């Protein structure tokens, strides 16, 4: 009887416990994972495997230039360059020494016997005619050139001969024409000739001054010495090559000593005929 009364009570207690468990289970289902984790401690799991290597990244910006490095070793000598342009022609060299006499040549063959002819006098006449014709041609050429222009003072005419000659040939050519190389013995004459040279578009010409006979003792073409007047360029005469015994006039009017073998134009002077 005692156990029979207790059965209903036991059943009632079990029912209450089951109901309580049901309520707890519903609360757990309705609660979020965060709430669950916040009320429960989760232990860390084991270490995972290494992941695969990622792709190469994009090339970054260039950095600043580093400090200047040390000087490198001397390189190998390069190949020779191409031949350059030909330079300007240098000044005329000094006159060379006279060469040795050559060896005698072989004797010529025997000539044919000639016929008799009394041609000597005719040859002399023909030879003189050739000389006269040559002088006439030279004079004709001179007259044609003179028409192109001369300069004059009260007593003299001056004419630039546009033929390249050395000093001695220039003297001869002026004498053949009846004059001599120009001798500027005063400032007025010197200025007239200098202006003449410039107006003709020239740079220099021979004039009648030299020290051929005695070094540093310059004389005119008529052998009269230089006296009170001269117009030397600064530093002249200097006999630079050791053979500068003749004189040229520049378009500036200055004088310069040069080698007599130089071939340039020259200026002649002629006395005016008095009436």
Curated annotation (Swiss-Prot):
It comes from the Eukaryota. GO terms for cellular component: collagen trimer; extracellular region. The keyword GTP-binding does not apply. This is Collectin-10. Residues 51-110 form the Collagen-like domain. Residues 153-269 form the C-type lectin domain. SUPFAM superfamilies: C-type lectin-like. Keywords: Calcium, Collagen, Disulfide bond, Glycoprotein, Lectin, Mannose-binding, Secreted, Signal. InterPro entries: C-type_lectin-like, C-type_lectin-like/link_sf, C-type_lectin_CS, CLec_Tetranectin-domain, Collagen, Collectin_CTLD, CTDL_fold. Its main location: secreted. Residues 39-76 are annotated as: Disordered. CDD domains: CLECT_collectin_like (cd03591). Glycans are attached at residue 30. Belongs to the COLEC10/COLEC11 family. Residues 1-25 form the signal peptide. Disulfide bonds join 174-268, 246-260. SMART domains: CLECT. The gene is colec10.
């Amino acid at each position: 009887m005692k156990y029979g009364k207790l059965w209903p009570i036991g059943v009632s207690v079990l029912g209450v416990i089951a109901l309580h468990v049901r309520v707890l289970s519903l609360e757990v289902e309705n609660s979020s994972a965060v709430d669950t984790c916040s009320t429960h401690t989760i232990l860390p799991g084991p270490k995972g495997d290494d992941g695969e290597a990622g792709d190469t990244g994009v090339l970054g910006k260039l950095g600043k230039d580093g400090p200047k490095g040390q000087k490198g070793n001397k390189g190998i000598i390069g190949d020779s360059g191409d031949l350059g342009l030909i330079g300007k022609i240098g000044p005329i060299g000094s006159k060379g020494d006279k060469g040795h006499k050559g060896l005698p040549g072989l004797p010529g063959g025997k000539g044919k016997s000639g016929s008799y002819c009394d041609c000597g006098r005719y040859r002399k006449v023909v030879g003189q005619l050739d000389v006269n014709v040559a002088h006439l041609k030279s004079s004709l050429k001179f007259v044609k050139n003179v028409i192109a222009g001369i300069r004059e003072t009260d007593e003299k005419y001056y004419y630039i001969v546009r033929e390249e000659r050395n000093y001695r040939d220039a003297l001869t050519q002026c004498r053949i024409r009846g004059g001599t190389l120009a001798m500027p013995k005063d400032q007025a004459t010197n200025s007239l000739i200098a202006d003449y040279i410039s107006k003709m578009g020239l740079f220099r010409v021979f004039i009648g001054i030299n020290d051929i006979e005695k070094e540093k003792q310059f004389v005119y073409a008529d052998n009269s010495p230089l006296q009170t007047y001269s117009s030397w360029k600064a530093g002249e005469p200097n006999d630079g090559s050791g053979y500068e015994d003749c004189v040229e006039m520049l378009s500036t009017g200055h004088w310069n000593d040069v080698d007599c073998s130089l071939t340039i134009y020259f200026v002649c002077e002629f006395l005016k005929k008095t009436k």
